[in-house]
């Protein structure tokens, strides 16, 4: 695809291994990988937002799936950043804002005010549970 000049965009929750394999393969093919990751402080906030969306006619997601995907997405974030040429992280807990930028795995910019979920994510080291090599096989 790259040799033919194609670019593409993939919207994802970063859950499961298939998205990591897709990103890895794209990287191997020479694509520039750019991630824009949006998160909120808790699954409870996500549930509330989804309930509001349902009231307005949007689709729902079962609570158990929200909880599962919330944690899984954060666990995959470290591995995904490792594959990215550029990763911008956004917090949407209260007001949507970008607060961190990674370039080639290095944190190059971070706001003075960082969200709770990001602090917790760094402290818990979610990246330690499964190696990237195990996930892309």
Across the structure, where does each feature detected by a protein language model lie?
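Glycine-rich phosphate-binding loop used to anchor ATP phosphates in small-molecule kinases
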Residues: 1-40, 73, 88
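Secondary-structure transition/capping residues
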Residues: 9, 57, 61, 88-91
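Conserved nucleotide-binding/hydrolysis micro-motifs of P-loop NTPases
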Residues: 15, 39-45, 94-96
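Short, glycine/charged-enriched secondary-structure capping and boundary segments
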Residues: 23-26, 49-52, 102-104
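Short, low-complexity, polar/charged sequence segments that are solvent-exposed and flexible
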Residues: 28-29, 54-56, 106-110
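A glycine- and Lys/Arg-enriched "phosphate-lid" helix/loop adjacent to the NTP-binding pocket
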Residues: 31-79
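NTP-dependent small-molecule kinase module
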Residues: 80-137
């Amino acid at each position: 695809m790259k040799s033919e000049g194609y670019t593409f965009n993939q919207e994802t929750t970063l859950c499961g291994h298939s998205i990591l394999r897709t990103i890895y393969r794209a990287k191997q093919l020479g694509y520039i990988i750019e991630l824009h990751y949006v998160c909120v402080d808790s699954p409870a906030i996500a549930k509330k937002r989804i309930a509001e969306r349902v009231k307005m006619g949007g689709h729902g997601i079962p609570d158990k799936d929200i909880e599962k995907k919330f944690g899984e997405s954060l666990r995959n974030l470290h591995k995904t950043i490792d594959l990215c040429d550029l990763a911008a992280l956004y917090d949407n807990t209260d007001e949507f804002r970008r607060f961190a930028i990674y370039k080639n795995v290095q944190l190059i910019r971070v706001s003075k005010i960082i969200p709770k979920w990001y602090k917790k994510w760094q402290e818990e080291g979610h990246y330690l549970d499964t190696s990237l090599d195990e996930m892309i096989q």
